[in-house]
UniProtKB/Swiss-Prot annotation:
Protein name per its UniProtKB record: Serine hydroxymethyltransferase
Modified residues (N6-(pyridoxal phosphate)lysine): 226
Cellular-component GO terms for this entry: cytoplasm
Gene3D superfamilies, alphabetized: Aspartate Aminotransferase, domain 1 (3.90.1150.10), Type I PLP-dependent aspartate aminotransferase-like (Major domain) (3.40.640.10)
Amino acid sequence: MSYIEKIDPDMFEAIQKEADRQEHKLNLIASENYASRAVMEAQGSIMTNKYAEGYSGKRYYGGCDFVDIAENLAIARAKEIFGAKYVNVQPHSGSGANMAVYFSVLQPGDTIMSMDLSHGGHLSHGSPVSFSGKLYNIVPYGVSKETEALDYDELMKMAKECKPKMIVCGASAYPRVIDFKKFREIADEVGAYLLADIAHIAGLVVSGVHPSPVPYADFVTTTTHKTLRGPRGGMIISKTEELAMGVNKAVFPGIQGGPLMHVIAAKAVAFKEAMDEKFRQDQAQTVKNAKVLCACLKEKGFDIVSGGTDNHLMLVNLNNMNITGKDAEAAMSKAGIIANKNTVPFETRSPFITSGVRLGTPACTTRGMKEKEMELIADYIETAIKNAGNDALLSEVSAKVRDLCSRFPVYS
């Protein structure tokens, strides 16, 4: 940091303040986590200096001997932790990974059946404001109004009616186990490709805490941060060599030029960390923590979408609390708790306002927090949301949150 402090004091100050925020605020954003010092060291390494268009052994630049080693390590480790045969670690993001999969087997105008964003899907699965919604004919599916969970019989019926070229499963705000085998059966019934986007649950999957889509899906995409605790980036797993060849061409030269070799090096480090028993224990604890936090909030009268959680996140419908997601997010922020407003199934408000909040336990679990801390956190959330206009009380909660965080440092 001394180099930045000397060259760019303004940026140094911003980084220091962000470091303080991360250490002393309670992060409940389900898509965020803390990369290890080893991952950050790799990402900040001299690998950033190297251009390496192409793939290992077939580059368009000389001098790629050692970045080839880095990419080969990332690929081999990804294959091992996911039990996969064909892996591309070059995508810069999860959305880019999805784009490459679409481009590899679909034509503009083809039909994609995917989860509606307001029911827990993702922008890149076909939202009208995303490239995916503009290029393809999107048939959205949602959760059952009765159970607020997926109804696979209804999905089969929809697929038979719309006959999609591709079915996308996976979500950014769905708290229940996804049955990838049933999705495979639905895809086979209508002759569709199956893409499983496991960006949120990848860490749970490699640890055996959530079923894996790899045996069932034609394509599996993921980010490498979130529950995987790696650098920000994407990855694609393909079921067959033929599909993998199409994906490789779609990634480069299709949508990207040079890969980010420093990020790929960091991905390799993260995948090695994911092989460790401590990582697996943390993933199991992440789910335990989510279940406890969820149960505590239910006891306090909060309406939990689908009645609970099977993974790392939960959706809280705040309509019975007479507060919007936007206002709840702001109140929690004043109390030192960082979360995000979120639409709930059958939402009636704007996505800028929302009726709910999404809460996740990956980041606080990485800090070492367990069930006992989840009970405290539920108390803090209740106080913040039920006293949104009481700045003095929110300040008191913030002090308690800061004390809690100080007992579980991110980078000790």
